[in-house]
């Protein structure tokens, strides 16, 4: 079973409700709480006896342009749905905060001048408190892309739990 506490004004008690439900179901031993507020997670603070089990970086794919191979044809910028690339006469500009890591630019490049690298956008944490598994993510300072980190938190929390 999944119970979601979502979409409310800040300070209304979403975290309090979620952690209270988790704590009340803890005796079943099959409770996981996924704090998807990756900009300011705090559900783990309600479980002071937690033990940190895992801390893992979350990465997204980003293009790397090999300038010496690039002919500045502009196909990469044309195919980019998020306008993360701008082709100028002498260079290609990448706006990493706009890039969604789809890889279309590297596929379309006729010169094979675009490869992919990865960039850390934050961390995922896994902890355990008696009867409760806690999963949360912390977005790196200055990072704008919350969606991939939220997705990683949700994937990590999947299982036979409430």
Predicted features along the sequence, with ranges:
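Cysteine-centered iron-sulfur cluster-binding motifs in ferredoxin-type domains/subunits
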Residues: 64-83, 93-113
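Switch II (G3) loop of P-loop NTPases
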Residues: 36-38, 110, 136-145, 152-162
